[in-house]
Regions:
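A mid-to-C-terminal "edge-of-domain" accessory segment
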Residues: 142-184
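Short glycine/serine/threonine-rich phosphate/pyrophosphate-binding segments
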Residues: 96-101
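Generic beta-strand/beta-sheet core signal
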Residues: 28-30, 61, 89-93, 114-119, ...
């Protein structure tokens, strides 16, 4: 069993070797959501030790999908405020059907990068769906992205075809019935 300092030394060695080889490095803090909830001092120890290294992005995953919009905002804001010069990405899992809401909270907290998947495909209950996140960024947060919205539906249908995972007709943004309505 290694000490936290030994883990940091291992990471430092790999990051510096990658830099020598001109390889860009991102750090994925596996199970960050549980770490920041139950062992924030450990999370801070790791980031404090690595923050001066040539790391492009620190990935903050909700690996088990345990966060909600309230604590997503709280924990992401904590990271952004404590480390204003670092670039953080948020990676949501959808175990409680909160991935998109958690992404919304992460962006409001100052997170600059968001991980999504087409149609929300991913392990267990999936990840934040690109189509929904794009709509939230534009319509709820009033922000623009460089994504070409007109291509989303085609990409979603292509992924549906090749993955064999069908898009529910009532799926927000991309479901075939989402823009229909019935009146009494």
């Amino acid at each position: 069993r290694k000490t936290p300092e030994q883990h940091v030394d291992d990471i430092r060695t790999v990051v510096l070797e990658a830099a020598k080889r001109k390889i860009d490095v991102n750090i994925y803090l596996e199970d960050w959501s549980n770490g920041i909830k139950h062992s924030p001092d450990y999370v801070f120890l790791v980031i404090d030790a690595l923050k001066g290294l040539p790391i492009r992005r620190f990935m903050l995953p909700d690996t088990l999908g345990v966060l909600n919009p309230g604590n997503t905002y709280e924990y992401c804001k904590m990271m952004v405020d404590r480390y204003p010069d670092l670039r953080f990405d948020f990676h949501a899992h959808n175990d409680y059907d909160l991935a998109v809401a958690n992404v919304y909270s992460a962006i409001r907290a100052g997170i600059k990068g968001i991980h999504t998947t087409v149609n929300g495909l991913g392990e267990r209950a999936g990840n934040a769906p690109l189509s929904s996140v794009l709509a939230v960024i534009k319509d709820q947060l009033g922000e623009e992205t460089s994504l070409r919205e007109e291509k989303i539906n085609k990409a979603s249908r292509l992924v549906e075809t090749y993955s064999g995972v069908h898009i529910p007709p009532n799926k927000p943004i991309i479901g075939e019935h989402v823009f229909t309505r019935s009146e009494e």
